[in-house]
Structures are given as structure tokens and as C-alpha cells.
Swiss-Prot record:
This is ATP synthase gamma chain. It comes from the Bacteria. Belongs to the ATPase gamma chain family. Pfam families: ATP-synt (PF00231).
Amino acid sequence: MASLKEIRAKVTSIKSTQKITRAMQMVAASKMRRAQERMEVGRPYAESMRRVVSHLVNASSDYKHPYMTNRSVNRVGYILVTSDRGLAGGLNINLFKKLMHHVQEFQNQSVEAEFAVIGSKGVSFFKSFGGKVTSAVTDYGDNPTFEQLNAPVQAMLDDYANGRLDRIYMVYNKFVNAMTQQPIVTQLVPLPDSAIDSADAGINTELSWDYIYEPDVKTLIDGLLNRYIESIVYQAVMENIASEQSARMVAMKAATDNAGDLINDLQLVYNKLRQAAITREISEIVGGAAAVS
């Protein structure tokens, strides 16, 4: 059994760790609130872009952009968004499981896959377990610009435009609330019907005006579809950042609480040992006094 000195040293060590985890919990809570605000600010832009694109697409049924054209699937690409740092519970592990399950379904149909990664945890995952990574970006911080994230996204879109990829998926953690993060795999291109459907986009076709487009619908669609996809990717990254901070806050709270439980248990053992030592000393004193008398 450990001595009183060893137990005191353990308690001191755990208290130091508890201070660190409590501080990390508070920092994560603050960062989560800021990430939530940025995420909420970005949503109206993404939804507005979706409505504009939907209106343009439905106004010009003659032109089909490559991003709206389905083709037979021989090779798929995944844009994977992970965190740069750990200590976030099972956030990244659950996302990897979701991704691998989705990839396995395609592999069972002899469809190949390649990956573009945002976040160092995703890069580390593929280094350990294999997988063709065509592009990656790390250290993107808590408030990245799209320019920081553009390289892997553009690499995937170029491969799709060149016919090397037949479908692209976006993989990230959706922020539900402070306690819940949901791993998501969603089709990016070709755009799913729900992305360009008037009803799903919130457009009332009965009250919709007929616009004059300059220079022409094709040019507008070509430009806006790229911006729309950029907005989807950026919003996914914002969701993942908020998810990361909320998961870290929860994990650090659990670590802080567990440290408190360990301290209480060790304190109980310490008190019992100390009580036993005092009792033994008293017994020795009483025994010695009795022997003298």
C-alpha cells in the first residue's frame, strides 16, 4: 500500500492536472460561443446563395452545368474536415468511422476513392491507415478564411471537371448543440436535387418574378455555382470548429470531474491511513506506559 507521502504527492499532481483541464474547459467554452456566432452569421449567406442558384437553374432548363449532371460512378472524392488539435473526446474517431463505412460501401461496388483533407488529425489518420490523399491543409485556426481552405477544395473540383472523379462528398461534424455533434457525409457535386429544388430552397414559384439576366444565365450559373460550393464548404468548416470546441469543453469537464473524484478517493485513503497510524501510535504509547507501570 502507498505511504502517506506518496498519496500526498498523487493528490498534488492530480490537483495540478485538474487546474489545467478546468482552464481548458473554460477556454473551449469561450471559443465555442465565438464559433457558434460565426457559424450562425454564415448560414443566411449560404441559404441566400442557395435560393439564387435555385432560381437561376429553374429559370434555365436548357443549360446543365457539369455540377448538376449525374454520371456513372467509377471514382469518388471526399473532402474531409477534421480538427487540428486533440483532446476533443471521440469527435474525430466517430467521423472517421462514418467516413470509412461510407467508403466501404463504394469499395464493395469496386468504386475507388481519394481524399482531400482539412485538419491535421485527418492527415495523421491517413498516414496511419492508408488512403490516397491528393491535397491537404492544416493549422487553419479558429477563424479561417476560404483562401486558407481553397487548395483541397479546388483540387477536388478540378478532378471532377477533368472527369477523374464522378462524385464528391463533404465529410464533417455538424453542430447540433453544446452536447451533441453529428458526423455527416453529404453529397457536394453533382448537386443533389434538394439543393436546386425551388420548394426546398424556399422559393414560392407562384409569386416568383421573371428576371432579365446579364450578361446571360449560363455565365451567372457558372460563376455562382462555384461560390455556392465555396459557401457550403466554408459553412461545414465553421460547423466543425464549433463541434470541436463543444466536444473539447465536454471532454475537459469530464476530465475535471474525474480528477475531483480521484482526489476524493485518495483523500479518503489518506485519512484512513493517517487514522490507522495515529491509532497505532496511541496503542504503542499506552502499551509502553502499561509496561513501565
